[in-house]
Amino acid sequence: MKKHHLLLFFLFLFISCSTHKKYGACELKETDETLSFPIDSDTKNNFNIYSVYKDKDGKEYFTFQNIENNTIHFYDLKQQKPAFRITPSQEGSNGVGRIFGYYIQNLDSIYVFNFYDSGLYLINKNCDLLDKQPFLGLKPSCFMATASQLPVRIEHTLYTCIEPNRLIEHDPVSVAINMNTKE
């Protein structure tokens, strides 16, 4: 009996002390390569919400939000050309209001944050409103989905920062949303 316990102990110790890392380290290296993207006259070049999105086929897009016209632009990262854009409706049955920030899970699941509302909207590439998730108990505040603080999804939970109005409110500075239970 003692041998079984000792064997289990060493097996547990061996597994827990494994040097295998689930995620490898990455390193950025400076290159002489320049990425240049042409923008049209309707697009402001002072955007602060941007990210890189890789689709299921491995194609990479540089994405950014044009706050002025409620649009998310997708540029082919390799060809450095506009690929497509999505412009969610602000009003109506598919309305999401004025967006400020987004998280692209895939082109059928694009989460957008409303600038004036404490909630999260789920749309697809065609801008169909699929779901709305209000953040109960929070006053309307500005969600801070900026390039320096993008929403992050880990398994079934989406984490994002918000900018509470500390002068008059006591809202939290971040929100975690379980995408399955919507809590």
Predicted feature locations:
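Short beta-strand elements that form the blades of beta-propeller/WD-repeat-like
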Residues: 58-67, 103-115, 121, 150-169, ...
